Amino acid sequence: MAKTGMYVGLDIGTTSVKVVVAEYIEGQMNIIGVGNAKSDGLNRGIVVDIDQTVQAIQRAVRQAEEKAGIQIKSVNVGLPANLLEVESCQGMIAVSSESKEITDEDVRNVASAALVRSTPPERQIVAILPQDFTVDGFEGIKDPRGMLGVRMEMFGVVYTGPKTIIHNIRKCVEKAGLGINELVITPLALTETILTDGEKDFGTIVIDMGGGQTTTSVIHDKQLKFTHVNQEGGEFITKDISIVLNTSFNNAEALKINYGDAYPERTSANEEFPVDVIGKSEPVRVDERYLSEIIEARVEQILRKSKEVLDEIDAFELPGGVVLTGGAASMPGIVDLAQEIFEANVKLYVPNHMGLRNPVFANVISIVEYSAQLNDIYHIAKYAIPGEKSKPAQSVAVQQEVRYDTYAEQPQEEYEEFNERESGEKVTGKIKDFFSNIFD
């Protein structure tokens, strides 16, 4: 059961920055504030302009503060999976106290012993997750505090990431005037919170299709075993539409949202709509099937890249199938196309919160839920990581009376609209055919 209190999640995405404020009362999560601001400071999930990213964070935070009636002081911020590495770790110590009763200090010491490793200078430890402990040969202990023992071992998982990415995210958040309670690995939070216990135990693939990149994750035995980032996302679909139809990026985005379908067999060549073409005085009629074929080409390329890396580790043998989420995954037809490509059971995850029933909010909600579920053992072990502070900051300061009902009053249309940014990546495969045929 989640702790009681207020939790704030921050998801810094390529196309938007999202903030969610949630109040937990007796384990019930109630979302009381949401912010969503266009992001101009990232490219393919990586911060490329700190000042613009800071401004987007501040806009999203202000929106959430106004709706929740609180002042946000610190956040739980998501960390992308770019160049993330996962390793097993093990540590062993002698219990230090004379009474041989295991204390918080012993747990921290055994976590420190597990972190004794040679970490390359360009990388740093992001998180350590204790799995279980062994006390004097007794295995499978989840919380050894208060037990008697002479020798204690800890088995867990350690995650490391590039210092540059981590530093830039921290810098943006701190420059926006916020503290950081938890730096949460986004695919870890996603797989932990959107899957059932059975899916996490027996093994499931999660594909998060964002605006600037697609993250493929595999969870098995309730552990995040594998992540892979493909630097293609929803904004690439928009870019393809813009180039092939010779229309502006904004028009292409509107076409994708209003008429887009990733599975041409579901569309009709008889259904047409007008497109404002650059260099022409009158709109050009384009049929629904042709637009769908443009979209299908890019989506198929993205999904096949995921399939390649998943085939290498035999991930499709896991019984949990594939779960799609993220803003780009909400397009009609993607589940059908994914089932055809993966030859596996595929489903779309949509958050079950009033006003936020859109996969685009899956990450930020997962960050909140994951942070709220972290236990004492995690926090004790976390302070064994070099540079971690001993106490988290207070998340919010209440400015006015807060309503703790579920977040249903704010219509989704109020969220700031945004257009996905342009990308210069060279398009391959079937997309090349569109670019050549358009001039025939």
UniProtKB/Swiss-Prot annotation:
Q: Does the keyword Oxidoreductase apply?
A: no
CDD domains in the record, alphabetically? ASKHA_NBD_FtsA
Question: Known NCBIfam families for this protein?
Answer: ftsA
Coarse class of the primary localization is membrane
Q: Which domain of life is it from?
A: Bacteria
Question: One GO BP annotation here?
Answer: FtsZ-dependent cytokinesis
**Function noted in UniProt:** Cell division protein that is involved in the assembly of the Z ring. May serve as a membrane anchor for the Z ring.
Q: Which PANTHER family match?
A: CELL DIVISION PROTEIN FTSA, CELL DIVISION PROTEIN FTSA-RELATED
Q: Which gene holds the coding sequence for this protein?
A: ftsA
Q: Which UniProt keywords apply?
A: Cell cycle, Cell division, Cell membrane, Membrane
Q: Which family does it belong to?
A: Belongs to the FtsA/MreB family.
Topological relation to the membrane, as annotated: Peripheral membrane protein
What quaternary arrangement does the UniProt entry report? Self-interacts. Interacts with FtsZ.
GO CC terms? cell division site; cytoplasmic side of plasma membrane
Pfam name, any one: FtsA
Q: What is the lineage of its organism?
A: Bacteria, Bacillati, Bacillota, Bacilli, Lactobacillales
Q: Where in the cell is it found?
A: Cell membrane
Tell me what this protein is called: Cell division protein FtsA
